[in-house]
Amino acid sequence: MTEQYQHRARKRFGQNFLHDAGVIDKILRAIRARPEDRLLEIGPGQGALTEGLLDSGAQLDVVELDKDLIPILNGQFASKPNFNLHQGDALKFDFNTLGADPRSLRVVGNLPYNISTPLIFHLLQNASLIRDMHFMLQKEVVERMAAGPGGGDWGRLSIMVQYHCRVEHLFNVGPGAFNPPPKVDSAIVRLVPYETLPHPAKDHRVLERIVREAFNQRRKTLRNTLKLLLTSDEITASGVDGSLRPEQLDLAAFVRLADTLSEKVVTE
């Protein structure tokens, strides 16, 4: 990064710029971009990953919120024919405007940790467009995404991400790889949306509602946390033990509960 392109990281944007060349190379090797790929980078920052992605020959769209980074990114990459920059909030970005074919978009990002969870949920709403996603996230968030039932990490994020995607915790990254160093460890995760959902719900919005309601009071039993949505008999009819706590249920059980609620809403 030359002096011309220096930029101070902003706390309000959750900026921690990746600078470790070894980590950058490891991420690029995990992505393995090809010239025929359609890439979307969220939060390119100072372009640590951007250059390597462009060197693959793939078409690259980038979305950056910080207006002060726009001239820096344009100064470095605007001459590249496969570079297209969008200034705006990725949380509000309409991915359909990219004109990507179904299951063609490869999404990459060193995501600001303060918006990573809502951004993941926004991307899951567009899962039909996405081939895969590679993100740098807070290690704790990746562990929650990849968690299984029965532990404290299993929750709303785990269930909804695993409903849509196969999750791979690839490797961890220490604070020293960033400037300024964050106070937490980071990790790279790969998310691959399913072509065919292994546990399809009748209405994924109802599944989201059931999961949210259940984990709002995760230490209580299901018959207590879901009492405003389902009776104890309806929970039992779903093949679920109402005396269990939410963290003890797997994804398939939550889908059965959601389908019971969907049927109940239709018949009422």
From Swiss-Prot:
SUPFAM superfamilies on file: S-adenosyl-L-methionine-dependent methyltransferases
EC number of this enzyme: 2.1.1.182
GO-annotated cellular components: cytosol
Pfam families (UniProt xref): RrnaAD (PF00398)
Binding site for S-adenosyl-L-methionine: N16, L18, G43, E64, D89, N110
Entry's localization field: Cytoplasm
One MF term in the entry's GO annotations: RNA binding
InterPro entries given in the database record: KsgA/Erm, rRNA_Ade_diMease-like_C, rRNA_Ade_Mease_Trfase_CS, rRNA_Ade_methylase_Trfase_N, rRNA_adenine_dimethylase, SAM-dependent_MTases_sf
PROSITE patterns recorded: RRNA_A_DIMETH (PS01131), SAM_RNA_A_N6_MT (PS51689)
Reaction catalyzed: adenosine(1518)/adenosine(1519) in 16S rRNA + 4 S-adenosyl-L-methionine = N(6)-dimethyladenosine(1518)/N(6)-dimethyladenosine(1519) in 16S rRNA + 4 S-adenosyl-L-homocysteine + 4 H(+)
Keyword terms of this UniProt record: Cytoplasm, Methyltransferase, RNA-binding, rRNA processing, S-adenosyl-L-methionine, Transferase
Purpose of the protein: Specifically dimethylates two adjacent adenosines (A1518 and A1519) in the loop of a conserved hairpin near the 3'-end of 16S rRNA in the 30S particle. May play a critical role in biogenesis of 30S subunits.
Homology family: Belongs to the class I-like SAM-binding methyltransferase superfamily. rRNA adenine N(6)-methyltransferase family. RsmA subfamily.
Identification of the protein by name: Ribosomal RNA small subunit methyltransferase A
Annotated organism of origin: Pseudomonas syringae pv. syringae (strain B728a)
Upper taxonomic lineage: Bacteria, Pseudomonadati, Pseudomonadota, Gammaproteobacteria, Pseudomonadales
Gene from which this protein is expressed: rsmA
